């Protein structure tokens, strides 16, 4: 399991005083950086090889600015030939889950416009002690 702490920012909130519905999607993406680095250690544009093809997001409770910090937990739910499914959750300090979702990303050769098999060395890192 990969974990990432997010500081809730005032601009994450909306007119009603709770976090805007897009904030968790941005937090989840930020938390995926560690996974992006497994696929592309330099995080260079030239080496970018992941396409997000599906996203789900469910809200379990309101998230207030006063919470100040959210922990995003990410796990590899499925590792296919050329795709990876990640499940993510946003947790308050008391351990309660306030949002959860999943994404499917495809390992892709942008130059040749085709999917590629995820290499074994990447698979090992993804499924290592923190991957599942």
Language-model features: where?
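Residues in well-ordered beta-strands of folded domains
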Residues: 7, 58, 104-106
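Hot-dog-fold acyl-thioester-processing enzymes
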Residues: 1-54, 110-132
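HotDog/MaoC-like acyl-thioester-processing domains
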Residues: 2-3, 64-66, 77-132
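Hydrophobic beta-strand-centered segment that forms part of the acyl-chain substrate-binding groove
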Residues: 35-71, 75-78, 98
């Amino acid at each position: 399991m990969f974990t990432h702490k997010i500081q809730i920012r005032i601009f994450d909130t909306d007119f009603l005083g709770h976090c805007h519905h897009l904030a968790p999607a941005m937090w989840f993406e930020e938390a995926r950086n560690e996974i992006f680095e497994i696929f592309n250690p330099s995080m260079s544009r030239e080496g970018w090889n992941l396409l997000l093809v599906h996203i789900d997001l469910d809200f379990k409770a309101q998230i207030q600015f006063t919470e100040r910090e959210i922990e995003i937990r990410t796990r590899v739910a499925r590792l296919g030939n050329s795709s990876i499914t990640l499940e993510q959750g946003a947790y308050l300090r008391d351990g309660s889950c306030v949002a959860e979702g999943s994404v499917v990303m495809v390992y892709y050769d942008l130059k040749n416009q085709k999917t590629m098999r995820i290499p074994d060395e990447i698979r090992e890192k993804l499924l290592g002690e923190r991957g599942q």
